[in-house]
């Protein structure tokens, strides 16, 4: 009898484990099925060259940036500069750019759904509309003029990213060889989307963070004046400006982007206050942009000398911020309770209907409301 009881208990445990495992599999299947089916080894969706062979990528105006021919070969826009300007948004042929739509939104382009999988009796794949305007990307890429960097423009009221450019870039129809990528400095970081995944010294944009802290922590701020001679002694070194700004109040110091004044303010506010306001500004956070995580910024204020803190206060020293985070910080909505987070996937057109891309939950309304006028 005891043997029967033990065997029954063992059977119940095995049945429970089976149910638990099945439930876990079903949950993961529902959650990750689209990502599984869009794996590059799936020859139903990828051609022999490893290129996604279904779906079209279009900009906000309906200009087709990438599509596939009947034989499954992938094609790109017919202007080489536009191809370079939209490279990090659309993606390259081999899927080396992880932030490109051909990789990041492969499940949406494939037309995958729980009912029929990736098979569609009414067509091959979906049309994916981005919020980007290819013309804006073209203009921004031309303005970079071969320099390394990133350009981002968005509608802060809706969160739509209108322009997202990263350089250096290359023509996806004529990609550089592996040797060129390694040996030619012009292609350094070409696979990196600097707007989403890069960090840079914020420079003078960071002065707005210092100013916000000073407005709230220094009651006499708008009564103060400073005289800039082009070099201000802070601690054991000088904080320099490109030229002398003369006598200034806080408004003219901001307009002149005076390093000396903001270095002095940073020293007076101190490390802890600067760190608090930097965190509140979201510059150390990672944003989720259409399902992609941006790089988090880094600011180290611990144990700095007075001169180092002064340079940190003007966005130099060891300060690093993500371009997307800076863009979101500088574009708060003044009317909404929640500021929409940026996104660049607009909608996808399926054989059955046109559906919006999954929404972003948004981020809390910025604590920074701009610079109030002097009392």
Where do the protein language model's features map onto the residues?
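Periplasmic/cell-envelope proteins involved in peptidoglycan metabolism and beta-lactam response
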Residues: 1-179, 190, 199, 224, ...
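Beta-lactam-recognizing serine transpeptidase/beta-lactamase-like catalytic domain environment
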Residues: 61, 157-204, 209-375
């Amino acid at each position: 009898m005891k043997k029967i009881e033990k065997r029954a208990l063992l059977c119940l445990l095995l049945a429970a484990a089976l149910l638990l495992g099945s439930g876990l599999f079903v949950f993961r299947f529902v959650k990750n099925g689209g990502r599984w089916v869009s794996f590059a080894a799936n020859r139903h969706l990828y051609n022999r060259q490893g290129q996604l062979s279904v779906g079209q990528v279009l900009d906000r105006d309906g200009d087709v940036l990438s599509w596939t021919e009947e034989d499954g070969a992938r094609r790109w826009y017919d202007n080489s500069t536009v191809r370079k300007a939209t490279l990090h948004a659309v993606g390259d042929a081999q899927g080396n750019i992880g932030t490109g739509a051909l990789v990041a939104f492969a499940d949406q382009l494939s037309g995958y759904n729980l009912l029929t999988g990736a098979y569609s009796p009414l067509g091959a794949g979906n049309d994916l509309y981005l919020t980007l305007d290819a013309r804006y990307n073209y203009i921004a890429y031309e303005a970079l003029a071969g320099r390394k960097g990133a350009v981002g423009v968005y509608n802060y009221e809706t969160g739509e990213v209108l322009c997202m450019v990263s350089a250096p870039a290359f023509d996806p129809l004529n990609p550089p060889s592996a040797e060129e990528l390694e040996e030619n400095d012009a292609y350094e970081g070409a696979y990196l989307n600097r707007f989403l995944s890069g960090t840079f010294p914020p420079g003078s944009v960071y002065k707005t963070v210092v100013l916000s802290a000073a407005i709230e922590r220094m009651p006499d701020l708008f009564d103060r004046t400073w005289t800039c001679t082009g070099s201000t002694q802070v601690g054991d070194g000088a904080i320099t400006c490109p030229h002398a700004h003369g006598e200034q109040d806080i408004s003219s110091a901001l307009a002149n982007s005076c390093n000396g004044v903001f270095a002095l303010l940073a020293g007076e506010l101190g490390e802890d206050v600067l760190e608090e306001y930097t965190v509140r500004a979201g510059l150390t956070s990672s944003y989720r942009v259409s399902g992609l995580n941006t790089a988090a910024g880094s600011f180290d204020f611990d144990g700095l000398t007075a001169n180092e803190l002064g340079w940190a206060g003007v966005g130099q020293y060891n300060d690093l911020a993500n371009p997307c985070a800076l863009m979101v910080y500088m574009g708060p909505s003044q009317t909404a309770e929640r500021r929409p987070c940026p996104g660049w996937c607009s909608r996808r057109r399926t054989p059955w209907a046109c559906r919006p891309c999954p929404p972003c939950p948004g981020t809390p309304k910025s604590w920074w409301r701009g610079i109030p006028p002097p009392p």
